[in-house]
């Protein structure tokens, strides 16, 4: 009598799978929804989810080999350029007029980078589709919650003093996470589902308090359309536009202010901000080399070092705080990262370019340089795209007619 097959159950592997599922559920579902009602949700929940993912990988060892992955990172020019930005930020503590707040800001930056690297190394070599389908589910649920809050916001947020701020940050998170959600659904040929996600996110951003997220989503849509039409052109345009704006940022107020005066008048807030930027560049051209040091752009407005109406964009703050070294290193890192994303994942490339364009537009419009919630949001987007790329291993199932017949036994 044949012996019935026996299966070995490993409780440790089951526990690791459960921890990983909970981690991705928190990262892809709980966090986007909670970010619509709490401005601190991203900073609090993201590290918890990352710890769960790291614990799961430590148990089942399903991640890629650590040292080869670290070696690839350390030999990647764009990664080294990014580390140069971090190093220059640390070195700027020597000449910043606010060493205490700048040290805290640098610690937040380093902690976010370390968290992202640990989560990257902890991601499994092959992602399960069940975990990745949580992403569009969470983005759609968060968009629905945002729509409901914006429609009946007075009743739901009357006891929440940070309601509008949470909605603005939640809208930024939705604009950025919409693209990896669409990328996953398109890679699974769920085009209708991806269209539903885009419509829900666009509806939520239309009702959101600010226009930053909606504008950034529109910029991302243009990058998506261009890359979908012609892959190499879309990647090249996105990389050159982002890196080029970082490089020539000090010239922008001199070019944009006459146009702004002609369109909106000389006393428009945006025109006055450009005038303040012009004055900073003209009065201290030598400081464009080293920058004024970390945290100077924010604290400088409070203590009168900068005009109160100075721009709050990434382009201004990067040059003002880190100078030409930080700006050129950041531009090189961004250019290399965009090209690498377009080369390594052609299926995901249109949505990856859209995410790069969306994030860059958000930074240019007014998020700033290294705000902790913004850095954590960028970290989430990076990890999400890496996870989706590792979920593309499935081959197409062969048709029944293509399976060779077994020879008949005589």
Region locations from a protein language model:
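A membrane-periplasm/extracellular boundary helix in multi-pass inner-membrane enzymes
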Residues: 60, 87, 148, 207-208, ...
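Long extracytoplasmic/lumenal interhelical loops at the membrane interface
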Residues: 264-322
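Membrane-interface helix-loop-helix junctions at transmembrane boundaries of multi-pass membrane enzymes
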Residues: 10-16, 59-79, 184-196, 229-238, ...
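Hydrophobic transmembrane alpha-helices and their immediate junctions
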Residues: 322-360
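Transmembrane alpha-helices of multi-pass inner-membrane enzymes
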Residues: 48-56, 353-362, 368-410
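Aromatic-anchored transmembrane helix interface
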Residues: 77-85, 99-122, 133-141, 172
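Alpha-helical transmembrane segments of multi-pass inner-membrane proteins
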Residues: 127-157, 164-229, 332, 336, ...
């Amino acid at each position: 009598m044949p012996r019935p097959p026996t299966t070995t159950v490993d409780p440790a592997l089951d526990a690791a799978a459960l921890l990983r599922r909970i981690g991705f559920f928190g990262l892809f579902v709980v966090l986007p929804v909670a970010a619509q009602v709490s401005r601190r949700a991203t900073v609090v929940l993201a590290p918890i989810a990352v710890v769960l993912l790291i614990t799961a990988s430590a148990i089942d060892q399903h991640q890629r080999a650590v040292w080869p992955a670290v070696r690839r990172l350390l030999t990647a020019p764009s990664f080294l350029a990014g580390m140069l930005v971090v190093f220059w930020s640390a070195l700027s503590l020597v000449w910043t007029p606010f060493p205490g707040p700048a040290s805290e800001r640098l610690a937040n930056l380093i902690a976010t980078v370390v968290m992202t690297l640990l989560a990257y190394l902890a991601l499994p070599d092959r992602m399960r589709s069940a975990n990745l389908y949580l992403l569009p589910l969470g983005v759609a649920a968060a968009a629905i919650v945002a729509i409901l809050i914006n429609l009946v916001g007075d009743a739901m947020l009357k006891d929440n003093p940070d309601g509008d701020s949470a909605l603005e940050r939640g809208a930024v998170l939705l604009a950025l996470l919409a693209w990896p959600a669409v990328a996953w659904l398109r890679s699974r040929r769920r085009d209708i589902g991806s269209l539903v996600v885009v419509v829900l996110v666009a509806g939520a951003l239309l009702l959101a308090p600010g226009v930053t997220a909606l504008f950034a989503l529109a910029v991302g849509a243009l990058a998506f359309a261009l890359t979908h039409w012609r892959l190499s052109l879309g990647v090249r345009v996105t990389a050159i536009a982002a890196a080029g704006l970082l490089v020539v940022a000090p010239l922008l107020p001199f070019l944009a202010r006459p146009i702004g005066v002609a369109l909106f008048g000389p006393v428009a807030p945006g025109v006055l901000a450009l005038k303040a930027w012009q004055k900073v560049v003209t009065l201290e051209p030598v400081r464009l080399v080293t920058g004024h040091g970390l945290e100077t752009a924010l604290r400088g407005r409070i203590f009168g070092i900068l005009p109160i109406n100075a721009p709050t964009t990434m382009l201004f703050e990067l040059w003002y705080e880190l100078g030409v070294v930080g700006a050129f290193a950041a531009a090189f890192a961004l250019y290399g990262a965009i090209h690498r994303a377009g080369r390594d994942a052609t299926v995901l490339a249109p949505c990856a370019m859209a995410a790069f364009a969306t994030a860059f537009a958000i930074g240019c419009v007014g998020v700033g340089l290294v705000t902790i919630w913004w850095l954590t949001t960028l970290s989430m987007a990076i990890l999400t795209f890496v996870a989706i790329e590792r979920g593309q291993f499935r081959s197409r199932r062969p048709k029944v007619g293509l399976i060779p017949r077994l020879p008949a036994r005589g």
